[in-house]
Amino acid sequence: MNVQLFVPCFIDQLYPDVAFNMVKVLEKAGCTISYNKNQTCCGQPAFNAGFWGEAKEVCTKFLTDFEGAEYIVAPSASCVGFVKNYYTKLFENSSHKSLAEKTANRIFEFSDFLVNVLQQTDFGASFNGKATYHDSCAALRECKLKKEPRQLLQNVKGLELIEMDDVETCCGFGGTFAVKFEPISVAMADQKITHAEATSADFIISTDMSCLMHIDGCAKNKHSHLKVMHLADVLASGW
């Protein structure tokens, strides 16, 4: 199965190992991976900030860069959710609408692709430790993913997965929300960290590094013992 890799800005600039680990898992699943070096942002930051004209230019490039791809897979429910749910609105009454619809149907978040397309949940991973899982807003509400990451984590040998209270509550990041409303954003992250600590977990795992970056920063500020890991890093462990 041919897969085009989409590496979001956060991953590309700050957490490149997540992308490499995603490739490692996809190749073990039997996929042939290709990567377009010309790819850039999906356009979500500009769109969310209200700059629809600028966003449209970036999104048009995205459509061109990934045109013809059999499957597009990304380690970010946030970016995937944006392409799936908002590209068709952005390109309504546009010559690019058809391509936007096709792209929306071909792009998948990493766990969604593994479980629902490849129908594989066990990659022989092993990771000794206690962890709790954070449902990102984009994964839960835009990509409709709940059970998929947990199915994958349940097959990781040595990993004890413990659910925290209010697991579906936002971590407070929300892109520019964290900048515009910092006190609220930090308070939401503190609540998430408190719930995670109550499970006695050592790690918080999620599909989205943007959430994890925010949680990690707040956890360090609180001198919490909690560490964060992307799902791809866990699935690529131990083999």
Kindly give the residue locations of the regions a language model identified:
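Iron-sulfur cluster-binding electron-transfer modules in prokaryotic oxidoreductases
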Residues: 1-239
